[in-house]
């Protein structure tokens, strides 16, 4: 890369990024003008682009939406994203409106999807990666496509027939194509993909450029049984459940202009697992490239942005966190992560190799829910019973309460979500008998502060930094255990699971290089506590009859201040359940042929229960993935591009267990 007379030149492609004399004028003439006509007739516009480059097309088009109530969703794909410093140098020479804001929000250059909330009515999705691969991970219908890569002769891969075919799949009927190119190869490729091509005068003396309009069909869709729903609806949203998932979902929809109501059966928010004294915001760490781990990375980055923007600093401390690889399986996961935007692996840490999670946070879940609840309409004492369709919407019934009406119904019931699928203590419905979902009991323990640590620490159990005169450790994990009362032996299990992090070797020698205070020293605060337990003596056994633990090394004089039981929802594959609920009878009838490759129904769209969605089964990391769940539901309801690659959206789809069952030929 080099600048020639203030214009960036790419030495690999031997081409400039823009016109010499008037880069903004060129952007407006070729690309921005294509938006003007649509702006007259539409309140929502989806613009997609191949080649973000310097961002001039985005900034030019975004300026048209400034001080407007119209909504712009701009998706841009870039294989070779530029460093922020290069963008800044270019903007110094050419004053672009919004350039400073873009620089402030510009993401790291890690491949993948990056969502930027540019303003209240403008969203920018930057998709970094090879266009052919990235396009396959997209699902939306654009109003306009901007083809702004290097010239076809210098970068033929970006103008291939496969790329054009994917663009056609992502176009609504009569969508526009705008490009500076007048290449016959580009024209033919567009025509073969179903576009009507016309040539118009080019910019600044260039003879011609292409305009095209989509009149064809989208072709075959891969994994058509996961195709997104497209419902029209009113603006009344009813959410069942006032934990973190329900609260954040309500906030998201309220910010989009929907009228939201939350129905909660308890007398307060965060009555279940979201009600803990404190909790850790961090992703689940898998081996690099595993879809579950990739989903958690996206969720984590989105959650960090959300809490930093919306939550008071006293309720969210972004201090980082450390996880220790206490067995070989975890070590194998950790060592696949080099130093990156999120992780920093340290093989030599004590008592085990560790991974430091940058921007992990110590959160106050209950207080966060209470903080948001002040802005929401929440009806307490409303225990969901059932619902019936009525005039295109729903009448939802509750135990001992008057029914509520809504256009959109969202379930965010946490561990009690299993009751919607024929399970749990109080079966309410059975939307899908193939669903794999269960409730897991977890007990946390509050102690008199015993360890001075500025960050959460995790191994078999986890320790949070002290808050005031309390320090939290946790948490047990017992599937299908519905006991509400705290149990002494569970407190003892929690103590046993953190004991190895509290011996003298750990306190003196564990790595502190990632801490904000480089001189910080871990310290045992309670001198009466003997935590000097060796690795060899960590084994213990549970006496199933009397429910007590026998320790080989006694932990002495621990002051337990209290305990709390919460229940978490888990799915059978550990992915949350986020999306539209399927019409199971339709799936079973239409997709029973899935096991046989021949005669497979191509593009037979799925059918969903109209405007009924779910955001649940977030397990132990609901503080992280619940934010992603709310964003995806907003994507679905507003029919905007997804914030995640489609392959990950499919992994989260509530219909996935039913589809897997049908693929095996099971009924």
From Swiss-Prot:
Residues 240-667 are annotated as: FAD-dependent cmnm(5)s(2)U34 oxidoreductase. Transmembrane segments: none annotated. It catalyses: 5-aminomethyl-2-thiouridine(34) in tRNA + S-adenosyl-L-methionine = 5-methylaminomethyl-2-thiouridine(34) in tRNA + S-adenosyl-L-homocysteine + H(+). Its EC number is 2.1.1.61, 1.5.-.-. InterPro entries: FAD-dep_OxRdtase, FAD/NAD-bd_sf, MnmC-like_methylTransf, SAM-dependent_MTases_sf, tRNA_MAMT_biosynth_bifunc_MnmC, tRNA_MNMC2. GO terms for molecular function: oxidoreductase activity, acting on the CH-NH group of donors; tRNA (5-methylaminomethyl-2-thiouridylate)(34)-methyltransferase activity. Residues 1-215 are annotated as: tRNA (mnm(5)s(2)U34)-methyltransferase. SUPFAM superfamilies: Nucleotide-binding domain. Keywords: Cytoplasm, FAD, Flavoprotein, Methyltransferase, Multifunctional enzyme, Oxidoreductase, S-adenosyl-L-methionine, Transferase, tRNA processing. It comes from the Bacteria. Its cofactor is FAD. Signal peptide: none annotated. One of its GO terms (biological process) is tRNA processing. It is found in: Cytoplasm. One of its GO terms (cellular component) is cytoplasm. Its main location: cytoplasm. In the N-terminal section; belongs to the methyltransferase superfamily. tRNA (mnm(5)s(2)U34)-methyltransferase family. In the C-terminal section; belongs to the DAO family. Catalyzes the last two steps in the biosynthesis of 5-methylaminomethyl-2-thiouridine (mnm(5)s(2)U) at the wobble position (U34) in tRNA. Catalyzes the FAD-dependent demodification of cmnm(5)s(2)U34 to nm(5)s(2)U34, followed by the transfer of a methyl group from S-adenosyl-L-methionine to nm(5)s(2)U34, to form mnm(5)s(2)U34. This is tRNA 5-methylaminomethyl-2-thiouridine biosynthesis bifunctional protein MnmC. It comes from Campylobacter hominis (strain ATCC BAA-381 / DSM 21671 / CCUG 45161 / LMG 19568 / NCTC 13146 / CH001A).
